[in-house]
Amino acid sequence: ALVTLLKGFKHVGLPISTGASYGLAALFGLLTMGIGALMVARIQLDPAADREFHFANVEKVFAVLMMITACSMAFAHGSNDVANAIGPVAAVVSVVQSGGNVTQQSGLPLWIILIGAVGIVFGLAVLGHKVMATVGSGITALTPSHGFAATLAAAGTVVLASGTGLPISTTHTLVGAVLGVGLARGIAAINLQIVRTI
């Protein structure tokens, strides 16, 4: 939320002060925490159950938390990949609008951002299912707790890179996070044939 408030809104003409951005980000964090706590509180836990059932209860909690990190990953994907996709178009439009002068910084028209967003959505709709299947189950078996760890690490890395202006690949970052989760259980937990093709 803080990256959006500090960096994103200024491109659409809604500059927010730094202090207000931190306050709104803290409120958003508290709201997300409250929603997560309500969802986790609804899960039925049985303290008299056996050990395997306790692991299932933990996975139920992480299934709820996974929804939050999946939203974070979607945000990170949009904040990073749309910028990577529209960068060359924005540069060309800037040069054309300035009469051939190359400037250090220029405004970004909203229609360019929308074209980038539509392109990302179209790409996900057409080829996204193959990437999701490979990352979600092809590299290693993922439980909700493993998926939570991988998406939290990948989303945090991508948002940090987007906020600092580093162009990185969201997909490669997520694949690296999934590999890390798989390696935590040993090299045998990873499908090396799939990793070679990636």
Q: Which role fits each region the language model picked out?
A:
Residues 1-198:
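Multi-pass alpha-helical transmembrane bundle typical of ion/small-solute transporters
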